[in-house]
Design a protein with these regions (language model features):
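Residues within mature, well-folded domains
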Residues: 1-171
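Intrinsically disordered, low-complexity terminal regions enriched in Ser/Thr/Pro/Gly
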Residues: 94-371
């Protein structure tokens, strides 16, 4: 059940059409067992296996060339396309493993099976420019997604419905927030009574059969307890720094990408009442995680790496009673001296010298000509 849940093509659409297609292929295989085949070859286990994996042909083609021999011309079946591999990798993870290593590659070459969603006849593309962030609102969680669809050649020019879906487990109904932006950039939010395990930003063309998505697993909270810190939200700094997530979303960056000639703002929330022994430390560390060309991970993680040398580091001590619980903090970092590459920004709070909570986010410092 978990495998089908993670392989569901779009959480924002009702039902799981991939699983329905799988069952339909099994039924079609039963129907074709004793039927004549268009190409004249007998039905067998090999043909059944191909049908289960790749579907049945929707049309056939034959050669019109003149043939001297008496055997009939070859007939070729054509399955629907474009088709995609929608299962995650790895399909199963160890209980102690890092679930954020799970990823999806719909355009995988030579997949074991394929499915062609009818709503993605023009393509099923990744959304690379996304920034997810989660904030506690009392007993619920607000999840926000800032996005930029301009790198997509279709959605940069054609209208799309953008939806943010959050999922907890296979048995809990998915919650969906919708947005129909006038431009290819925007923000969509959704509120849930639980901490999401999967975040999925999905775009569907309004006048074209094209779909796109960015899906990410969220790291479990340490010891299953509510986090002391929210995710870090990157924003473009202005004259006045934001004091709430609503204000931060008004200038949010649509991707964890920092341009070398610009400063970057960090917004987060602390959910414990600080006292005079509470210390906040921010560090920026070079990292080599991720494959070359892959965008930074789109959602923060509730942990910090081991202490290493950081080119940017700052810390301060909170004043007792200076701010109520849950009020946001904002700082502006100048990363213009850093070379291009991938970095990890961490915000860690300590109480009486002991770590109380941490939040980290991957960012990439872009080259000067990159936009």
């Amino acid at each position: 059940e978990r495998i089908w849940w993670l392989a569901r093509p779009l959480y924002s659409r009702p039902g799981n059409d991939l699983r329905t297609e799988h069952y339909a292929r099994h039924m079609m295989a039963r129907l074709l067992e004793d039927a004549e085949t268009p190409d004249g070859f007998a039905w067998g286990r090999d043909r059944r296996e191909l049908l289960i994996r790749f579907g049945w042909p929707t049309h056939w083609a034959r050669s019109l060339e003149q043939r001297i021999r008496l055997e009939p011309p070859p007939i070729l079946g054509h399955e629907p396309g474009p088709s995609f591999w929608l299962f995650p990798a790895p399909i199963l993870t160890d209980p102690w493993g890092d679930v954020t290593e799970v990823h999806w590659q719909p355009d995988k070459e030579g997949p074991p099976a394929r499915y062609a969603p009818p709503y993605a006849a023009v393509g099923f593309a990744p959304i690379d420019r996304v920034q997810f962030a989660r904030f506690r609102l009392g007993d619920s969680t607000l999840t926000a997604a800032a996005f930029d669809l301009t790198p997509d050649s279709v959605f940069a020019m054609r209208p799309a419905d953008v939806r943010l879906a959050v999922a907890r487990d296979p048995r809990t109904p998915v919650l969906v927030g919708r947005e129909s932006p006038a431009t290819a950039r925007g923000v969509v939010t959704v509120r849930s009574a639980w901490r999401p395990a999967v975040l999925s930003l999905e775009a569907l063309g309004r006048d074209t059969s094209r779909a796109a998505r960015r899906r990410a697993m969220t790291a479990p909270d340490p010891m299953g307890l509510p986090p002391a810190l929210s995710d870090i939200l990157l924003f473009a700094p202005a004259d006045v720094l934001p004091g709430s997530w609503e204000a931060a979303l008004s200038t949010v960056l649509s991707a964890p990408l920092v341009h070398p000639e610009k400063r970057v703002g960090l917004y987060w929330e602390m959910f414990d009442q600080p006292d005079s022994t509470t210390t906040v430390e921010i560090a920026v560390t070079r990292t080599s995680s991720g494959s070359k060309g892959d965008p930074p991970y789109s959602v923060g993680r509730p942990w910090c790496p081991l202490t290493t040398a950081s080119p940017v580091r700052l810390s301060w001590r909170e004043e007792s009673g200076s701010r109520p619980r849950g009020v946001g903090r904002s700082v502006v970092l100048d990363l213009r001296s850093l070379p291009r590459g991938r970095y990890l920004i961490t915000v860690q709070i300590s109480v009486a010298g002991r770590p109380r909570g941490c939040s980290s986010r991957e960012v990439r410092v872009a080259a000067g000509e990159e936009r």
